[in-house]
């Protein structure tokens, strides 16, 4: 379904909450037809039908795309958005306390992600911290992360996983916590501007 919106992009983040229920976070074109604005949709019947739930934040002057969301409790959610307001590229955090019905802006977890920006990936670790990974596209091109011990109200300084990228064409991570408490991160990567792009991986203790 198009939800009466234009330019829906398949840059989707989703959270399965029940056997037949899933909440999706997608991007649509803004009212001027340009990229982009994040919204939330939901299916309660295993994908037979979908309903629009809410926009995440006001329509931006720049863009708001490629969301990463996490359900904190029954009604509490957090969403991290790839944001651009020239000349800045950053990651902005929103929170909902009514099961995605409305959202309020919290903060910027990452003040700068480098040229063009990069989307985040987010999980809750077993020790309760929120863990957010992203690609940094300015030199030194790198994979970095931040953590929060207060459900996203504040964030620590960025920590570098690796910084040997060949150029800015990198990032788009996915993460999972392993049974030993380490984190497995996979991401789009390159070793040289003219080299092949590939999926890289790192395992580390956060």
Enumerate the language-model features and the residues they cover.
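Asp-box/BNR beta-propeller blade signature and adjacent active/binding-site loops
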Residues: 1-206
């Amino acid at each position: 379904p198009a939800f009466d919106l234009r330019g829906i992009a398949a840059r989707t983040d989703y959270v399965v909450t029940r056997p037949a229920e899933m909440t999706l976070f997608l991007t649509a074109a803004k009212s001027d037809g340009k990229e982009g604005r994040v919204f939330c949709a939901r299916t309660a019947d295993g994908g037979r039908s979908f309903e629009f739930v809410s926009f995440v934040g006001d329509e931006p002057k720049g863009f708001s795309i490629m969301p990463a969301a996490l359900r904190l409790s029954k009604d509490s959610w957090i969403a991290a958005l790839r944001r651009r307001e020239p000349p800045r590229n950053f990651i902005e955090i929103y929170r909902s306390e009514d099961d995605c019905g409305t959202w309020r802006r919290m903060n910027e977890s990452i003040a700068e992600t480098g040229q063009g920006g990069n989307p985040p990936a987010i999980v809750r670790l077993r020790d309760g911290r929120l863990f957010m990974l992203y690609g940094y596209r300015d030199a030194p091109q790198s994979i970095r992360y931040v953590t929060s011990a207060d459900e996203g109200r504040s964030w620590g300084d960025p920590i570098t996983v690796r910084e040997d990228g060949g150029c800015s064409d990198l990032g788009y991570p996915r993460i999972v916590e392993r049974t030993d408490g380490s984190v497995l991160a996979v991401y789009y990567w390159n070793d040289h501007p003219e080299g092949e792009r590939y999926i890289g991986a790192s395992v580390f203790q956060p």
